[in-house]
Curated annotation (Swiss-Prot):
SUPFAM superfamilies: HCP-like
Domain of life the protein comes from: Viruses
Name the UniProt record assigns to this protein: Putative sel1-like repeat-containing protein R815
Protein's organism: Acanthamoeba polyphaga mimivirus (APMV)
SMART domains: SEL1
Sel1-like repeats: 129-164, 165-200, 201-236, 237-272, 273-308, 309-344
């Protein structure tokens, strides 16, 4: 759990330093002596928050760590480079920083200043090998220019003639993937090997992967483990993550959960999203003393909140099975929806067919009106009888309770007719709907719940404040009137005619409940136009 300040409620990132927003004497205080700040204890996310807030010292610390990271290891999701004065002052002149900036622009789908591209191109033509690599990157991903893989290969090859680190890495990646060139794993392996003289951790990690899978070279698990460990010790998050998995499963080493935890924590602290998920899994799947359900739940929530699909599915499983939390089928359904996993939803609800909203013209409404009047007439007749005739106060109280229940049902139905509630609208949502659903949260926008009635599974899906149809089904399925009817029969069991009348009322009540459920199933529609627009993707 994050440690919060008692005064300003903001996160305390280190014991040595905290910029309290509630204390005017320290509000604008910036520590100049870095030795008083334990930056090593901060995660990459926390460091980025400080850097985004204008702390130049932290900006420099982060850049020193990531300037030789590959695209997949840089925590772009936490970084706001345009707020980093220290960084932007060196664009477009420092080509290492330019490469990071290009990747960040691509990750965030942002526009880039054309003058930066022009500057890179001019330097590339002047045989600046770092600029040649960057201009290849510009053309490969279409950053500020039209995507052109042939041009990208040309510039990568030019930089490779002088064995530029990133030129070798990027060209090797193209051969490994077969993108723009014929797939040649052996060529990729040779290019990565050439780059190893730079002692660059990302290259070691690529070679480790190829040794592990036997791609482009002879399979060698021990060599793979050795390279992963070297890159991990250099602080490379993806290598730390891979090494942790090898320690967890005993690939190339003796199985060691404690060491796996150590490397996953380091990788997580360096901003690796995969490590967040895997660390949560480790805390769930191992035995004591490592097992920690509460921490696992926090980590899985964190990974799911960043739309990591494996974490979203696993979080649904946590809610489904009550792993470290109370079982919550509604939230399980919600997270399976976010993952686009309709199969799991169907399994969860124990039904074979999905049902969508259905509006039918029928006479059930009239039937409900009619049976309501019949039931109320019978009940009120008995109320009068016991009130002015027989002196059985307890009978009178029970009939009055029964009358209240029927009036409550009528009230609920009237409210339902005026609402935008809906029911039986479960429809498998495929991956194409996931982005739409991710805009909403279970707490603020969506009400999702399942229930059983007469051996059938139902589901409501609607606005959080509109759950009337579910309330009604729950109310009817509990049949609160049954206990009252049973008590009335027990009190009057010696009077055969009275018991017969009570059973007649009970029969009508059960028929009424079943008709009410059918009414909800067949006629409840989405009547709120704004609601229809907002959630229209559900009913495509």
């Amino acid at each position: 759990m994050e440690n919060l300040c008692d005064k300003c409620s903001s996160v305390i990132y280190s014991k040595e330093y905290h910029q309290c927003l509630a204390n005017s004497t320290t509000r604008n205080f910036i520590v100049c002596n870095s030795t008083t700040i334990n930056y090593d204890s901060l995660t990459m996310k926390q460091l980025c928050e400080l850097a985004n807030g204008g702390n130049k010292q932290v900006q420099k610390i982060i850049l020193d760590r990531i300037q030789f990271f590959s695209y997949g290891s840089v925590p772009h999701r936490y970084i706001e480079f345009k707020k980093w004065e220290y960084f932007m002052d060196k664009i477009p002149h420092n080509q290492n920083y330019v490469r990071l900036y290009l990747c960040w622009i691509y990750y965030n789908c942002m526009e880039i200043d054309g003058s930066i591209i022009a500057h890179i191109k001019n330097l590339a033509k002047m045989c600046n090998i770092d600029a040649q690599t960057n201009y290849g990157l510009v053309n490969e991903y279409g950053i500020g220019v039209k995507k052109n893989i042939k041009k990208a290969i040309k510039w990568y090859k030019l930089s490779c003639y002088k064995e530029n680190l990133f030129g070798l890495l990027f060209l090797g990646s193209l051969y490994e993937r077969g993108y723009g060139v014929s797939c040649d794993k052996h060529m990729a392996f040779n290019l990565y090997e050439k780059a190893t003289k730079h002692n660059y951790p990302a290259v070691k990690r690529q070679l480790a992967f190829m040794y592990r899978t036997g791609s482009g070279t002879t399979k060698n698990i021990n060599k793979s483990h050795e390279l992963y460990r070297e890159a991990a010790n250099q602080g490379y998050p993806l290598a730390q993550y891979a090494l942790a998995l090898q320690c967890k499963y005993g690939h190339g080493c003796i199985k060691n959960y404690k060491e796996a935890e150590t490397w996953l924590i380091r990788s997580y602290n360096n901003g690796c999203l995969y490590a967040t998920y895997s660390l949560a899994r480790l805390y769930i799947e191992t035995k004591s003393p490592l097992r920690n359900y509460s921490r696992a739940f926090e980590l899985m929530q964190e990974a799911a909140s960043e739309n990591y699909l494996l974490a979203i599915n696993y979080l649904a499983k946590i809610y489904k099975n009550g792993i470290g939390v109370n079982k919550n089928i509604s939230r399980a359904i919600y997270w399976y929806y976010k993952a686009g996993n309709s199969t799991k939803i169907t399994e969860l609800l124990e039904i074979n067919n999905s049902v969508i909203i259905n509006t039918l013209d029928c006479n059930i409404f009239t039937c409900l009106d009619s049976i309501e009047n019949e039931i109320l007439f019978d009940i009120q007749l008995y109320i009068l009888k016991y009130k002015y005739g027989d002196k059985c106060d307890y009978n009178l109280q029970l009939y009055q309770q029964l009358e209240t229940i029927v009036f409550e049902c009528i009230k609920l139905r009237n409210a339902l007719d005026k609402s935008s509630a809906l029911t039986t609208c479960l429809k498998p949502i495929t991956k194409e709907y996931r982005d739409e659903l991710s805009k909403f949260t279970i707490d603020t926008d969506v009400f999702v719940k399942h229930y059983y009635f007469n051996k059938q599974t139902y589901m409501t899906f609607g606005k959080a404040n509109v759950k009337l149809s579910d309330d009604i089904i729950f109310f009817l399925s509990k049949k609160p009137y049954i206990n009252i009817v049973n008590k009335l029969i027990c009190l009057n069991k010696t009077n055969i005619d009275t018991v017969k009348d009570i059973k007649s009322i009970n029969s009508k009540l059960q028929k009424y409940a079943n008709l009410f459920v059918r009414y909800i199933e067949e006629t409840v529609n989405i009547r709120n136009t704004m609601f229809q627009i907002k959630f229209s993707f559900i009913f495509r």
